[in-house]
Amino acid sequence: MNLLYRKTKLEWRQHKEEEAKRSSSKEAAPTGPVGPGAVPGPGVRVRDIASLRRSLRMGFMTMPASQEHTPHPCRSTMAPRSLSCHSVGSMDSVGGGPGGGLTEDSSTRRPPAKPRRHPSTKLSMAGPGAETPPSKKAGSQKPAPECRESSRKVPPQKPRRSPNTQLSVSFDESCAPAPSPRGANLPLQRLSRASRITGDLDAGAQEEEPVYIEMVGDVFRGGGRSGGGLAGPPLGSGGPTPPAAADSDSEDSEAIYEEMKYPLPEEAGDGRANGPPPLTAPSPPQQTHILQPHPHPHRRPASALPSRRDGTPTKTTPCEIPPPFPNLLQHRPPLLAFPQAKSASRAPGDGVSRLPVLCHSKEPAGSTPAPQVPARERETPPLPPPPPAANLLLLGPSGRARSHSTPLPPQGSGQTRGERELPNSHSMICPKAAGVPAAHPAPAALLPGPPKDKAVSYTMVYSAVKVTTHSVLPAGPPLGVGEPKTEEISVLHGMLCASSRPPVPGKSSPHSGAMGSAAGVLHHRSCLASPHSLPDPTGGSLTPLWTYPATAAGLKRPPAYDSLKAGGVLNKGCGMGAPSPMVKIQLQEQGTDGGAFASISCAHVIASAGTPEEEEEMGAAFGAGWALQRKVLYGGRKAKEVDTEEDGARAWNGSTEGPGKVEHEDRGPVPSGIPVRSQGAEGLLARIHHDRGGSRTALPVPCQTFPACHRNGDFTGGYRLGRSASTSGVRQAALHTPRPCSQPRDALSQTHPVLPLPLPPQPARERDGKLLEVIERKRCVCKEIKARHRPDRGLCKQESMPILPSWRRVPEPRKSGTPPCRRQHTVLWDTAI
């Protein structure tokens, strides 16, 4: 503050002097050789100084000491000002020679008098009568030179009037608006003072004397007004400047808000500018998303306001949502929620084209999406054929994912990248439903900001489920919809992982019968808002669903949480250790029906996804874990980093969860990738519940959902897609047979009932081969990174924990003892650090 203030003060003085000279010269010219003409410049300067002092007093405690004490106690301190002012005045003195020397003294004495005069200047602004009181005040202030100065001051007062109209008016402007913003506005003032200074200079506050106001909000503005761009150029708040000039008074009162507003519009404009391209064309959205993720991240750190900025613009321009959502969602997931719906509607093609871009731009899912893209693209072709079913599934999944949206939002960043590839069941769906599917990716991207790591997990889950869905597609016939039904199943699987399979409601007519509609549909509906289940058939409903998920407090999301927690149907039950059997039963029941496989997976995914949310919400770790997850995701957005982090987390964070997740993964590897999820929901959720007791609360959710989905997609290679967040799950899913963990296989035996559907995964095994390759690479990288970053992991343990548990699964050793030791070791690291 002191440094900034000093710099500002110096600049202000310099610019003020320059402006004072200019104004004095101008005033002198109109005034002519009249003595007062010479004084006006210094008088104005003195006033500016006084107003600055007051503003400094009001605004900065440090500033008052330097300026107030310096000018008031010591005229010598003011001497430079008065000299500089008089130097300007010297030009005036040329006009009024006799007043020159006196001008210096008067200017020296004037600064105190003029500050007092400023209040009177308010009157003087109203009428010349006010000038007289300033003279009296000045006289009272300085008894001995009073008479001289009074007489001398009187002429300056007249110039003051003209300066009041010019400079003083600007001072009034800065003074009057400043009062409300004083306290809160000072920090912002620095940022906005450039714009306000510029605006004030241009606006020339009509009321000069509100010294208090000036002190409050326009300390820099007032100085800047007189000083021109002194503070303004350094601050470089040019963008807001025009508004500041227009609304200097209201601006000062609303300075804080205004500053926020201006940046908001700027960001809104940027977001809108970026957003509309996605709306316009798929390729622009890709570029926009790729480019915006970086700008928005910068804005985000700049302030929480950016989120507001983008949030408001997002609402205004749905197109803007996709670009800002990846990075800004952390700040405003709810804000993006509604625009999200718009995004869903507006970005049918965009979602497809931009989602992959986002996936790449989002590092966590970026690596995964690349492998995922092939799977997703492969699966995507089938998905488009059944757009109606896709829409239903989309609605269901998005609602589910959104009820689950806290984890899903991370998808936005991670999933957006893989969305097209299949990170998002929605993205997958996007190919299905031109308009609605895109909406899902956008919402996913929007929501991801806050729970980004979950998004990664879910992106992985989506990918895994997606692949599994494709694999399940052969089993899809039980659905009885044929190819479209298979498409729905794919979507459902994507949703199962990401949105707890709300697509089941979408497919509820074909799928609910196979699923044991009570278990599958009920579960999905409880997971997603009933509207989700109902609107499933409607693309329009999808948008509300997105809003529901996007809005953390959105109407739909709360219902989802209610279903997860209160309704709980299967979500909370699954989330809870006891209800997990219900999920398992549902899985088995649904698993009995080949078509119900997705529904079962959905139930478990819901349980896992819902459970993670519940866990997160139930445990303080939810917020902290979420933030950590986001940090981890942001920090290690690269799929390799994510994998490494997750692996490391498994080693040190998922020791307990590691075995459970290993089981889960092994279950997942079972042909019934979704049943794996079911078991994961059951056993893993139970483990998560236990682990939840620990810091894994948030972590199990993404990892669980991820691993389950990966396992669900294991046959399909969905786990491959999910390898990024749940690489361990993916790798183990691929390697589930070789996996040494017998517990997961036990769980697998439990999930085997659903194996019938997983049989289709064979086609996806080709993808699995590629995914396995990637997974192996990631394993190596993760091992290396683990060795290097485990200390970091210890630091980020809480952050990474949510994601890492699934990675903990990645370690083939699955040594419950060793991973716990690692975790403990990491924990020690955290404690030590």
From Swiss-Prot:
Top-level taxon: Eukaryota
Q: Which UniProt keywords apply?
A: Phosphoprotein
| Pfam families to which the protein is assigned, alphabetical | NYAP_C, NYAP_N
GO term, biological process aspect, one: phosphatidylinositol 3-kinase/protein kinase B signal transduction
- What post-translational changes are documented for it? Phosphorylated on tyrosine residues by FYN upon stimulation with CNTN5. Phosphorylation begins at 14 dpc, reaches a peak during perinatal days in brain, then gradually decreases.
Which residue stretches does the UniProt record annotate as biased composition, category Pro residues?
A: 275-285
Q: What family classification does the UniProt entry report for this protein? A: Belongs to the NYAP family.
Outline what the protein does: Activates PI3K and concomitantly recruits the WAVE1 complex to the close vicinity of PI3K and regulates neuronal morphogenesis.
Write the protein's name.
Neuronal tyrosine-phosphorylated phosphoinositide-3-kinase adapter 1
Which organism is this protein's natural source?
A: Mus musculus
